[in-house]
């Protein structure tokens, strides 16, 4: 009877071990989904080319559609005065490291197992950019980028990290575990911006 009890106890421990460690990757992946919520909207800041003398104008607003919240970037992009962008961005600062970056850096050995970023978006049919900066890109003109198309309906777009392009010739490849700045940008030409994002996730 004692041997049977000890055997049953061992089986329970083995089962507990399996459940904990088998579920851990799923838990980690679930935590790499970042729906836009009021409590985290403050981590996203609007910025335009006016910081460098441009004349583009716009705004980022927290909107709601039923139970879903989203960030909406609207404005007039102008290439006058060497400008040409409006954006909303989240970044690591000296005093703040948003949860999104914390989990990217902790997941899959500093992010090396992640394959791309997925957005739930809608817009006005224009083309927009995701721009990423890492600890190796400190100049404002150094970044990695990927474009995506929009329509008037909500849709998911996948942007594989190995398809991100560098703004600089011979810049080292994008190292996911080093991401420090993430932006959704209306960029590069004269047009009206209207793009909404309800969720950002990493896969």
Where are these regions (language model features)?
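Generic short N-terminal amphipathic or hydrophobic helices
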Residues: 10-13, 25
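Beta-rich carbohydrate-recognition modules and glycan-binding surfaces
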Residues: 26-203
